[in-house]
Amino acid sequence: MSNIQEALKTLLVQKNLTDDMAQKVMNDIMDGKVSDPEIAAYLMGLAAKKEAVSEIVGSARAMIDHAKTIPSEFEAMDIVGTGGDLSGTFNISTTASFIVAGAGVPVVKHGNRAASSKSGTADALEALGVTIDLTPEQATDVLANAGQTFLFARSFHPAMKYVGSIRKSLGFRTIFNILGPLTNPTRPRTMLVGVYTKELLVPLANVLSELGVQEAILVHGQDGLDEVTLTTKTDLAILSNGHIREATFDPQDYGFDYVSIESLQGGTPIENAKITEHILAGKITGPMADTAILNAALALFIAKKAQSIDAAIQLARETLINGTALGQLGALRSSSRAVTA
């Protein structure tokens, strides 16, 4: 009996797969050894049962093993979200990543084009003039030169070609929506992860711990955003050296007023790129800038660049005021172009 057949029989009776079995099945999928109908049945079986931690861990390990690797001498972090919140906001985590890198924390952002929104990370960066399709060597050079780089998921996970059309035809979230933020080829040990549903916060914190992540904050806005939100409170799962605790973040505790979700709305990649650049340049203040600051602050805090959330918020603000966040965009733009010239 093949791995996929054994897995399907297990899923048929609503039992969880071990991480070893999930890894074997994903290895077979990534090697092109599983038929489209079997892949579809497998994804449906996992989704119907709800993916277990063991299944996510095993699948993530297989995906990372099949990814192009990028060796790095830097201790870089990732700021990433699952997407799928259908909110239509501007590219919050992408904007925050420039603030974080500008504050001196190297960032390796791993992302893709939009799936359920108008503008994914790759779309926005491309509209900002950043060259997104880099080889591992080029991405490493950009990180060394700019303190920040971008790994285009489509390029670094070539084996995903075996599931792309199936995912589109199914039309619902699958385990791959969850795996995206977990499969950065650099295996960062520090992360800020946005999650589209509260029920995944603690399970994904456990997954990250199993994958070797040491410090992470997983966030889900109570308004549904897979970001730290400014419209209401944000639910958190905080991972620190294998220990996980839940918390709630309220921006009102830090002097911010709640805003409407409409005030955070973005648009096309070009429109979102303009929003990001204007926030970094200080031309946009208010709800959008404050939301980017809050997300950057939690990233700076978990990266131990600031000793408290208050100090992290102040550092994020200073990075905008003194121009280093905007300079970070310029550095990423010029460095990514230079290595591909």
Swiss-Prot record:
<feature type="binding site">
    <location>
        <position position="93"/>
    </location>
    <ligand>
        <name>Mg(2+) 1</name>
    </ligand>
</feature>
<dbReference type="GO" id="GO:0000162">
    <property type="term" value="P:L-tryptophan biosynthetic process"/>
</dbReference>
<keyword id="KW-0057">Aromatic amino acid biosynthesis</keyword>
<keyword id="KW-0460">Magnesium</keyword>
<dbReference type="InterPro" id="IPR036320">
    <property type="entry name" value="Glycosyl_Trfase_fam3_N_dom_sf"/>
</dbReference>
<keyword id="KW-0479">Metal-binding</keyword>
<dbReference type="Pfam" id="PF02885">
    <property type="entry name" value="Glycos_trans_3N"/>
</dbReference>
<feature type="binding site">
    <location>
        <position position="81"/>
    </location>
    <ligand>
        <name>anthranilate 1</name>
    </ligand>
</feature>
<dbReference type="InterPro" id="IPR035902">
    <property type="entry name" value="Nuc_phospho_transferase"/>
</dbReference>
<feature type="binding site">
    <location>
        <position position="121"/>
    </location>
    <ligand>
        <name>5-phospho-alpha-D-ribose 1-diphosphate</name>
    </ligand>
</feature>
<protein>
    <recommendedName>
        <fullName>Anthranilate phosphoribosyltransferase</fullName>
        <ecNumber>2.4.2.18</ecNumber>
    </recommendedName>
</protein>
<dbReference type="InterPro" id="IPR000312">
    <property type="entry name" value="Glycosyl_Trfase_fam3"/>
</dbReference>
<dbReference type="GO" id="GO:0000287">
    <property type="term" value="F:magnesium ion binding"/>
</dbReference>
<feature type="binding site">
    <location>
        <position position="167"/>
    </location>
    <ligand>
        <name>anthranilate 2</name>
    </ligand>
</feature>
<comment type="similarity">
    <text>Belongs to the anthranilate phosphoribosyltransferase family.</text>
</comment>
<dbReference type="GO" id="GO:0005829">
    <property type="term" value="C:cytosol"/>
</dbReference>
<feature type="binding site">
    <location>
        <position position="81"/>
    </location>
    <ligand>
        <name>5-phospho-alpha-D-ribose 1-diphosphate</name>
    </ligand>
</feature>
<feature type="binding site">
    <location>
        <position position="227"/>
    </location>
    <ligand>
        <name>Mg(2+) 1</name>
    </ligand>
</feature>
<dbReference type="Pfam" id="PF00591">
    <property type="entry name" value="Glycos_transf_3"/>
</dbReference>
<feature type="binding site">
    <location>
        <position position="226"/>
    </location>
    <ligand>
        <name>Mg(2+) 2</name>
    </ligand>
</feature>
<keyword id="KW-0808">Transferase</keyword>
<dbReference type="InterPro" id="IPR017459">
    <property type="entry name" value="Glycosyl_Trfase_fam3_N_dom"/>
</dbReference>
<keyword id="KW-0328">Glycosyltransferase</keyword>
<feature type="binding site">
    <location>
        <position position="227"/>
    </location>
    <ligand>
        <name>Mg(2+) 2</name>
    </ligand>
</feature>
<feature type="binding site">
    <location>
        <begin position="109"/>
        <end position="117"/>
    </location>
    <ligand>
        <name>5-phospho-alpha-D-ribose 1-diphosphate</name>
    </ligand>
</feature>
<feature type="binding site">
    <location>
        <begin position="91"/>
        <end position="94"/>
    </location>
    <ligand>
        <name>5-phospho-alpha-D-ribose 1-diphosphate</name>
    </ligand>
</feature>
<comment type="subunit">
    <text>Homodimer.</text>
</comment>
<dbReference type="InterPro" id="IPR005940">
    <property type="entry name" value="Anthranilate_Pribosyl_Tfrase"/>
</dbReference>
<feature type="binding site">
    <location>
        <begin position="84"/>
        <end position="85"/>
    </location>
    <ligand>
        <name>5-phospho-alpha-D-ribose 1-diphosphate</name>
    </ligand>
</feature>
<keyword id="KW-0028">Amino-acid biosynthesis</keyword>
<comment type="pathway">
    <text>Amino-acid biosynthesis; L-tryptophan biosynthesis; L-tryptophan from chorismate: step 2/5.</text>
</comment>
<keyword id="KW-0822">Tryptophan biosynthesis</keyword>
<comment type="function">
    <text>Catalyzes the transfer of the phosphoribosyl group of 5-phosphorylribose-1-pyrophosphate (PRPP) to anthranilate to yield N-(5'-phosphoribosyl)-anthranilate (PRA).</text>
</comment>
<dbReference type="GO" id="GO:0004048">
    <property type="term" value="F:anthranilate phosphoribosyltransferase activity"/>
</dbReference>
<feature type="binding site">
    <location>
        <position position="89"/>
    </location>
    <ligand>
        <name>5-phospho-alpha-D-ribose 1-diphosphate</name>
    </ligand>
</feature>
<feature type="binding site">
    <location>
        <position position="112"/>
    </location>
    <ligand>
        <name>anthranilate 1</name>
    </ligand>
</feature>
